[in-house]
Swiss-Prot record:
Residues 25-51, 90-124 are annotated as: Disordered. It comes from Simian immunodeficiency virus (isolate CPZ GAB1). This is Protein Rev. Residues 90-106 have a biased composition (Polar residues). GO terms for cellular component: host cell cytoplasm; host cell nucleolus.
Length: 124
């Protein structure tokens, strides 16, 4: 199962999945009966229980499989290496562009600003 060779790992995984399934089945979605306030309160309590079940499920997986449910810390690049430049733009910030703007297909847009949302060939 899932590329493992040891049957005891598979049995442990199946046991963990069965426990998690029972947890989620024990908390069905609330019924749509009653006043708006009562329904809202039932949904709020249901979401709180779902959150608890999710946390318990993570602990069950960690216990049965021997690994944490979330990956470790990610290494992020240094802040000075990050930029907000557009990949398509080759022009530096602060320089003026005297040529006419182009569309994604490479066509130039007239200076009057006839920007068509529908594109070429579409009837307005």
């Amino acid at each position: 199962m899932a590329g493992r060779s040891e049957p005891q790992d598979d049995a442990r995984l199946l046991q963990a999945v069965k426990i998690i399934k029972i947890l989620y089945q024990s908390n069905p979605y609330p019924s749509p009966e009653g006043t708006r306030k009562a329904r809202r309160n039932r949904r709020r309590r249901w979401r709180a229980r779902q959150k608890q079940i999710s946390e318990i499920s993570g602990r069950v997986l960690a216990t049965y499989l021997g690994r944490p449910p979330k990956p470790g810390d990610l290494e992020l690049p240094e802040l000075d290496k990050l930029s907000l430049q557009c990949v398509e733009t080759t022009q530096d910030v602060g320089t003026s562009n005297t040529s006419q703007p182009q569309t994604a297909t490479g066509e130039t847009v007239p200076a009057g600003g006839n920007y068509s949302i529908l594109g070429k060939g579409a009837k307005n």
